[in-house]
């Protein structure tokens, strides 16, 4: 009997230690999911937070963007989207810098939508050709000379490095990769993402 009680006690202790480790690992994981520099769309107080690791040269990322926006539109004020960069396509880092430079002029989201819409014209044989993406930025009210200059800023390269480091720590090796309130998708697909978002909405809002 004493041996059984000792075994049970050890199991309970091990469970408590494991729970503590998981609990204390959460803040670090949250930091790796969304950094202060991450572009965000939606109410900052929304209780459902979608984090997407994306590559502007990724065709599937382009396809998913309007789907994610439709989820947000269906639940106004309840969902926030943060974007992280995983420019796995050759040359895609330069397009990321273009977006970040547009962001410095307050035009990030219009620039992103224009760049994604024009993606078939500047992605050639799975390679991002940043020089072909410039026409997509016409008509957005951007100072394109300043965009070109700002693309060389070291802090823009640092954002990409940080996002790639976080992607590696989280096991992200393809795009798009989604996390909803810290939970990864069990399988990839539109319905799977919607299901994860619906679950988070129920948990947060009832």
Give the ranges of each region predicted by the language model.
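C-terminal cap of thioredoxin/glutaredoxin-like
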Residues: 1-21, 135-206
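Short secondary-structure boundary/capping elements
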Residues: 32-33, 63, 159
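Conserved strand-loop elements at the edges of beta-sheets that form or border functional pockets
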Residues: 43, 52, 187
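A short beta-strand-turn-helix
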Residues: 31-48, 73
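Hydrophobic single-pass membrane-insertion segments
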Residues: 20-30
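Structural alpha/beta surface segment adjacent to cysteine/selenocysteine redox centers
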Residues: 46-138, 168-173, 198-206
């Amino acid at each position: 009997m004493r041996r059984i009680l000792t075994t049970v006690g050890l199991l309970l202790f091990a469970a408590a230690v494991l729970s503590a480790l998981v609990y204390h690992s959460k803040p670090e994981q949250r930091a790796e999911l969304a950094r202060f520099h991450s572009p965000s769309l939606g109410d900052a107080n929304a209780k459902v937070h979608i984090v997407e690791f994306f590559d502007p040269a990724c065709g599937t990322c382009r396809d998913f963007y309007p789907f994610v926006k439709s989820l947000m539109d269906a639940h106004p004020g309840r969902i926030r989207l943060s974007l992280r960069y995983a420019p796995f396509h050759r040359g895609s880092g330069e397009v990321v810098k273009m977006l970040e430079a547009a962001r410095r002029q307050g035009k990030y989201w219009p620039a992103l939508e224009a760049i994604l819409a024009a993606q078939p014209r500047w992605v050639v044989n799975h390679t991002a050709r940043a020089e072909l993406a410039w026409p997509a930025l016409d008509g957005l009210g951007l100072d394109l000379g300043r965009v070109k200059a700002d693309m060389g800023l070291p802090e823009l390269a640092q954002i990409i490095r940080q996002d790639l480091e976080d992607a590696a720590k989280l096991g992200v090796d393809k795009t798009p990769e989604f996390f909803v309130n810290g939970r990864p998708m069990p399988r990839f697909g539109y319905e799977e993402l919607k299901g994860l978002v619906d679950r988070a909405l129920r948990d947060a809002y009832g």
